[in-house]
Structure formats: C-alpha cells, structure tokens
Amino acid sequence: MPVPPPPAPPPPPTFALANTEKPSLNKTEQAGRNALLSDISKGKKLKKTVTNDRSAPILDKPKGAGGGYGGGSGGGGGGGSSGGGGNFGGGGPPGLGGLFQAGMPKLRSTANRDNDSGGSRPPILPPGGRATSAKPFSSPSGPGRFPAPSPGHRSGPPEPPRNRMPPPRPDVGSKPDSLPPPVPNTPRPIPSSLHNRGSPAGLGAPRPPFPGNRGAAFGAGSVRQNLSSSSSPFPRPPLPPTPSRALDDKPPPPPPPVGNRPSMHREAVPPPPSQNSKPPVPSTPRPGAGSQAPPPPPPSRPGPPPLPPTSSDEIPRLPQRNLSLTSPTPPLPSPGRSGPLPPPPTERPPPPVRDPPGRSGPLPPPPPINRNGSTARALPATPQLPSRSGMDSPRSGPRPPLPPDRPGAGAPPPPPPSTSVRNGFQDSSCEDEWESRFYFHPISDLPPPEPYVPTTKTYPSKVARSESRSGSNRRERGAPPLPPIPR
C-alpha cells in the first residue's frame, strides 16, 4: 500500500476513479494498472472482512469479560505482541492491530494479577506452555469458549491451571507445593519474573515434564529428581559412577542398562552409595570392585602383564570386543577409560555376562582386564552367570586357539554377535557395536610409524609475512602475479 502513495490514501472506489483517469493519460499502462488495482481491491476486501471480524470480538470480549483473563491468556504469553499475533492466526496484520489495541489492557491486567496473585500466576504459564498460550488465543476465535473461562478466572484464576498442571506431571503431584524450595532450579521464578514472556517461560516449563519422562539428566530431568529426592544438586555428580554401583547392588542389571543413563539417573538418585563409589571413579571401577570383592580386582591388575605377553591371544580377542582395545596395549585402555569413564560403566554391565564365565573358565585374569568394572559387577551376578558359563566357556576355549589362526578371526565375530545381542539391549554406546561388527587390526599388523627426525620447516606464507613486516612491499606485489602466470 505505501508503495503507490497517491492511490493509497483514498478508499478502493477512489482507486478505481483515479486509475480510470490515469490510464487515459497513459494507454500503454492501462492493462497493468487494472490488474494491479483488481488484485489490490481483492486483497483489501479480504483484509477488511478479517479486520472487522477479528478486531471487534478481541477488543470487546476482554473489556466485557474482564481484562484480567485477557491478560492471563494472551497478555502473559503475548507480552511480545508478535507471538500473540501468530497465535491469533487468521489475518496477520489485523491480528497484530487487535493485539496492539488490546495489548495495553492485557499488560495492565497482568500487572494487577501479579500484585493480586503473583504466585498463582506462574502455574498458568507452565501447565500448557505452548498449549496454554495457543488455547487462549484460539479460544477467542470460538466466542463460546472465551466467556466460559473468563468467569472461571474471576472465581479462581490460579485453580484451573493447577488442575491442568498435575496431568502433565503425574509423577510429581506435590510439585506445585514443593516449588518454593527448588526455586534454584529456576523453572518457576522465570515465569513469575517474566509474565510478559509467558510463552518462553511456558516453553521451559512444559519441557521439564517430558524430558523428565525420558529420564534425561539435563536440567529438566534433574528438576524432578531434585523434587523426588531432597538432594537437589548432588544427584548429578554421583550419577556417572552410580551405574556401576547400582548394577552391583542389583544382580539383574540387564533391564536398567537399557536406558542406562536416563533410567539409572532416576534410580541412582535414591541410593547414596553411589557417592561412595564416586571417589573411586577416577581409578575406574577397580576400587569399587575391591570394596565389594577384593579377590577378583587384584587379579585384574596382575592380569595385565600376562595378557600383554600373549599378544597372539589378544589379537583375536580384539575383534570380539572383550578387550575393546584394552589388551593390545595397556596404555591405550587407560586413556580410553579415563576419558569415557561414565560411558564404560554403562557399556560394561552387559559384558560381565561373558567375562564372569571366563573367570569360571581357564582364563580368569584376562576377563578382569577386559572390564575392570565388569569384575565388580559380575560378582553379584556370578551365581546367575555360571548357568551361562556353559555357553561362554566354549568361547573361552576357542579363544586361545583362535590367536594362532588369524584367519579364524572371522570366527570370533560370530560369538560376539550373540553377546552383542545381549548387550544390544543394555548398551547404548556405539563402541561395543562397532567392536562386535568389525574386525580391528592389532597394532602388530600396522606398519611402524616413520622415525621422527627434528628438522627446520619452512612455510612460504610465514616468509611472505616476515617480508611484509620488513617493508619489502614490492616483493609481495611481485609474488601474486606469479601464480596466475602458470594458470
């Protein structure tokens, strides 16, 4: 509209008159102007209908039904009028105009509501988050719905949202009551302090329930954990070690590991022993294993020396995923474990199924090395494992012969798949899957790296920079033309 200023000010009929006069002056542009006018007039008609229909009810109903509800529904979430406009839908520009006109009363109502019931207001935003913001805006389109909620808000605005609150968070029914203590989590204070930004606050609020359901340990998940267990910040640190501890305590670890990190975080929060296991974490689960079953862990440490000498045995095992890069070179396992300590606990619980039988078999030292944590975890589960030892003992038997036959390396992978099937349910990490699927060459097969020779290296880019610093600009200018010449 602002693009053609002369025709814009008059209404559509004036448009037609002015255009009829102008085309007579310019005959060549008659068709183009007529088409533009027809399109503009059509657009204007549609816009008029939308603006009249939408603006009148929006302005009238909030005033008649009480600005308070308007603020609760739209003002809080629509403090940014742009967000409100999107929710109104229909005609964007008319919705925006309606928002601007009704925005002032909404903001005032929000201020009043904050003064009247500051604490009660926040629940309105979180319960629906996006849903609530969308519902109130969509409700005005349906006039029947709008008046009904308004009386409810008059009678008790905070109550209806609270009724909505519990369904999204059935696990934490007392959350609204317990909200004040967990304020540090800051899901609540944000809505209270940012009613105008109700939409973002709501977004933050609804997410906690859903991620909590997933058991994610991210801020939202921790909120529930903190509510469920008074130790709000503490559950997170012990969590990484907890998988090892909890698995030790629970002989049937397979089910929990399925969602090890998510589920374990929830389950691990209650058991404080996890904290006890945390200090040993730096040294991997060995110390924890020592506390629970000192005899096996010691073999695990002395075990490393025997394994390295039997490089042939280690080579076939690498593909089997038992050693997982630990046997070929003891230094490698240590860095790998030191970095991903938390993940290995999740990965290791399943392997104990294999390794403990190995203990029963003729190779007790190697299994402890294969997974230091597995020794500790396998101990509680050992009674169950002997039954599987029959299955695993043959594996331990073929392993020694396999080393001489590297071609047989193809054979070791088949047994791992069965174990990987077991672990597939438990392990969420990709390392185990890759180790079971693919065959990794031992270090002995790889060619030795070139010897390191200290030499001075020259970099032309640095040379040019040094010259430019010295002030020889002519050389720089000469250098660029040279490359184009060969081209």
Curated annotation (Swiss-Prot):
Entry keywords, A to Z: Actin-binding, Cell projection, Cytoplasm, Cytoplasmic vesicle, Cytoskeleton, Methylation, Phosphoprotein, Repeat
GO cellular component: actin cytoskeleton; actin filament; cytoplasmic vesicle; ruffle
Modification type Asymmetric dimethylarginine: residues: 33
Compositional bias segments (type: Polar residues): 21-31, 419-428
InterPro entries, sorted: PH-like_dom_sf, WAS/WASL-interacting_domain, WH2_dom
Tissue: Isoforms were differentially expressed. One isoform was ubiquitously expressed, another was muscle-specific and another was expressed in the liver, heart and testis.
Cellular location(s): Cytoplasmic vesicle; Cytoplasm, Cytoskeleton; Cell projection, Ruffle
Residue spans of biased composition, Pro residues class: 1-14, 157-170, 178-190, 234-243, 269-285, 293-309, 328-355, 397-418
Stored Pfam families: WH2
GO molecular function, one term: protein folding chaperone
Biased composition (Gly residues): 64-100
Modified residues (Phosphoserine): 138, 222, 324, 334
Omega-N-methylarginine PTM sites in chain numbering: 121, 130
Sequence ranges assigned to domain WH2 in this UniProt record: 32-49
Span list, region Disordered: 1-487
Function: Plays a role in the reorganization of the actin cytoskeleton. Contributes with NCK1 and GRB2 in the recruitment and activation of WASL. Plays a role in the formation of cell ruffles. May participate in regulating the subcellular localization of WASL, resulting in the disassembly of stress fibers in favor of filopodia formation.
PANTHER family: OS06G0326200 PROTEIN, WAS_WASL-INTERACTING PROTEIN FAMILY MEMBER 1
Name of this protein: WAS/WASL-interacting protein family member 1
Protein source organism: Rattus norvegicus (Rat)
Taxonomic path: Eukaryota, Metazoa, Chordata, Craniata, Vertebrata
Gene symbol of the encoding locus: Wipf1
